Every structure is written in structure tokens, then in C-alpha cells.
């Protein structure tokens, strides 16, 4: 019988496939003793690895490469509209990225294979973070220092950059990381901390959608398109609340 990795209480974030003909193969990523290719073959048997052999490993905060490159550091890359949006929102050194994705509960079959649990919803869950320590925009340095990162192959874009961090991590699964409101089918309907419903808190990229206080949470029907939503507090009191929330997720005080 095949060995059964224990995913209890853990996230296995599977990066999307790369549109380029080069990059990190899914078979070069390892989690709990299995390659990502093996995991995907079980939960998504129709995925075509011949057509999409490479993944877009970004943000690279897991450290799941079989052969980690010398000098590996966590990095998150952006260019074009997302990069300009982050610049326009004033994102800089010291700011915190909270990474979220779509997750669905899995379970092991008796033969040891992994599959999605029947009826389990797809939910938005926060799975990791990084505190920006440097923003690298020199394209030659990106190629030289981070050759494994997908944005090392995007240096033709003048606004290409890497956000680097010394403080970063991947979370164990827990209720406080769930963004999607439980018990309903819309994964974009989020439960945020109550302070987010204040008119002095802004969440970028949401158009006319704003958080509304419902049952002790700020309920937001989050934008269906967009990658980076920047939360900004306009008063010292709300800035303190925002910081406290981030620290409660991360598990330690921010510098």
C-alpha cells in the first residue's frame, strides 16, 4: 500500500502552471514526501503534464524545491498592472503581504491515494505571509541572484520587481485564516475583522463593494478579478487594530 502523508491541519498550496516553456517542473517540488506532480495526479487526474510541465512558483515562500538553490530567499514577483497598483498604494519596505488562495479539503482513500473530500467547498484561506525587507527592481540582479524565480524570466518588463523578506512563513490551518464566510457557496464573500467596516479603512480594487458590519464581522463581497488588495487605515487607532490583526495571524509582534 502506498504511504499516506498526513495533511491534517496543513495547507498544500499548488501553484498554477506556467505559460512559459521553462521554469520549475512540478516534479521538482516536494511536500510531505511526495512530489507535487504525484499529488496533482491523484486529486486532478486529467491534468496534462505534457502540455503544462512547469509551474509558476510565486510567491516562493514554502522552500519546497527538491534541490534548493544556494542563497535561496523567499520572494514574491510582480510587473505591469499589479506592480503599478502596489506602487500607487504606497506599498514599501515594512509592509506585510498576507497570501490567500483557493483551498479544498482532501482525504486519503483506503489505497493511500489522495482525493478531494466529497461535498467539501472551495474556500479562500490565508496560507502565508511575508514582511517586505527589500524591493529589488534591478533586472540584472534579479537574473543573477534569483535565477530560479519565475520573474527572473520576466526582465523584459521595465517595472518587473521582486519583493524580498527575512520575516516570512506558511501557516498551519486554523479557523482564523478562513476568509470565505462559512455555510454559504460564494467563496468571494469574506468575513473580515469588524474594524474593516469603518469608513476610515479602505480596501483597494473593490470598486463599489465595501465591507458591511454583519454579526460581528465586516462582510465583503470581494472583487472577482484582481490579485492584490491593499488594506489601509486612516487613523492611528485603526492602524493599531490592523496591525494587531496581522500579528494575531502571524503569531508574533511586527518590528
Feature-to-residue mapping (PLM):
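Contiguous surface segments at macromolecular interaction interfaces
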Residues: 1-38, 122-126, 135-255
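Conserved hydrophobic positions within beta-strands
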Residues: 130-132
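Short N-terminal edge-element motif at the start of the domain
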Residues: 41-123
Amino acid at each position: 500500500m502506498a504511504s499516506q502523508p498526513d495533511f491534517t491541519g496543513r495547507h498544500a498550496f499548488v501553484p498554477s502552471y506556467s505559460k512559459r516553456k521553462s521554469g520549475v517542473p512540478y516534479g521538482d517540488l516536494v511536500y510531505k514526501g511526495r512530489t507535487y506532480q504525484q499529488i496533482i495526479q491523484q486529486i486532478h487526474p486529467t491534468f496534462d503534464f505534457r502540455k503544462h510541465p512547469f509551474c509558476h512558483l510565486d510567491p516562493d515562500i514554502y522552500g519546497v524545491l527538491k534541490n534548493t538553490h544556494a542563497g535561496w530567499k523567499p520572494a514574491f514577483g510582480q510587473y505591469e498592472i499589479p506592480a503599478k497598483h502596489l506602487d500607487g498604494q504606497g506599498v514599501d519596505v515594512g509592509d506585510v503581504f498576507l497570501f490567500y488562495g483557493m483551498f479544498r479539503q482532501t482525504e486519503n482513500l483506503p489505497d493511500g491515494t489522495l482525493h478531494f473530500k466529497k461535498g467539501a467547498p472551495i474556500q479562500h484561506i490565508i496560507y502565508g505571509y511575508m514582511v517586505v525587507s527589500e524591493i529589488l527592481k534591478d533586472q540584472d540582479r534579479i537574473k543573477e541572484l534569483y535565477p530560479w524565480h519565475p520573474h527572473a524570466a520576466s526582465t523584459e518588463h521595465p517595472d518587473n520587481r521582486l519583493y524580498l523578506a527575512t520575516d516570512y512563513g506558511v501557516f498551519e490551518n486554523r479557523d482564523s485564516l478562513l476568509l470565505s464566510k462559512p455555510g454559504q457557496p460564494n467563496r468571494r464573500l469574506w468575513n473580515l475583522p469588524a474594524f474593516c467596516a469603518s469608513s476610515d479603512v479602505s480596501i483597494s480594487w473593490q470598486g463599489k463593494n465595501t465591507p458591511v458590519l454583519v454579526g460581528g464581522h465586516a462582510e465583503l463581497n470581494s472583487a472577482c478579478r484582481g490579485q492584490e488588495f491593499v488594506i489601509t487605515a486612516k487613523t492611528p487607532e485603526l492602524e493599531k487594530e490592523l496591525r494587531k490583526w496581522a500579528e494575531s495571524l502571524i503569531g508574533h509582534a511586527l518590528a
